[in-house]
Amino acid sequence: MSLDTVVEDVRDEARARAEDIREAAESEADEIVAEAEADAERIREERLAEVDRQIDQEREQTLSSAKLEAKQERLGARRDVLEDVYDDVEAAIEGLDGDRRRELTETLLDATLAEFDDDEDVAVYTHTEDVDLVEELVEDRNAVVDGEIDCLGGVVAESDTSRVRVNNTFDSILESVWDDELKNISERLFDQ
């Protein structure tokens, strides 16, 4: 065998080895590229899913906020209507006159004085415009009109001996009835 043949064999062997290395490197590079592409696709899908979740979450938050705001608006409007109704009732009570006012005041005075012992001296307070009426109603009773109070009508009475104070004003009756009946009033007004 000649030197040329040996050199040629070594070259062929080197070429074959280089080809094997190149093929192995290409195969490994293809695997790396395929893995990178798969990772990139997985990351892209994860990001898209996260964006979709964020969009859904923001949509739900926006919807919830809008529903809450609408509910608050409805409640505010209902509160305003109820306040208007209360004001109208107050105005109607304040506008009572004549026999109806006398009848209601006398009923409240009777209920108030019933809370005291018969021998107690009772001081009665009433609305400015009702002083004359109440003075007339307390005649021949153990009570005297002792002043005026800021109210729609009715009476407040107290006794020094028993330290009892009874508030039977139109205001207190209205407030009590309003509190007790607010749910029914609301249901009737808003058909719930």
Curated annotation (Swiss-Prot):
Pfam families: vATP-synt_E (PF01991). InterPro entries: ATPase_E_C, ATPase_V1_Esu. One of its GO terms (biological process) is proton motive force-driven plasma membrane ATP synthesis. The keyword Electron transport does not apply. GO terms for molecular function: ATP binding; proton-transporting ATP synthase activity, rotational mechanism; proton-transporting ATPase activity, rotational mechanism. It is found in: Cell membrane. SUPFAM superfamilies: V-type ATPase subunit E-like. Keywords: ATP synthesis, Cell membrane, Hydrogen ion transport, Ion transport, Membrane, Transport. Its main location: membrane. One of its GO terms (cellular component) is proton-transporting two-sector ATPase complex, catalytic domain. It is a peripheral membrane protein. The keyword Magnesium does not apply. Component of the A-type ATP synthase that produces ATP from ADP in the presence of a proton gradient across the membrane. Belongs to the V-ATPase E subunit family. NCBIfam families: PRK02292.1. Has multiple subunits with at least A(3), B(3), C, D, E, F, H, I and proteolipid K(x). This is A-type ATP synthase subunit E. It comes from Halorubrum lacusprofundi (strain ATCC 49239 / DSM 5036 / JCM 8891 / ACAM 34). The gene is atpE.
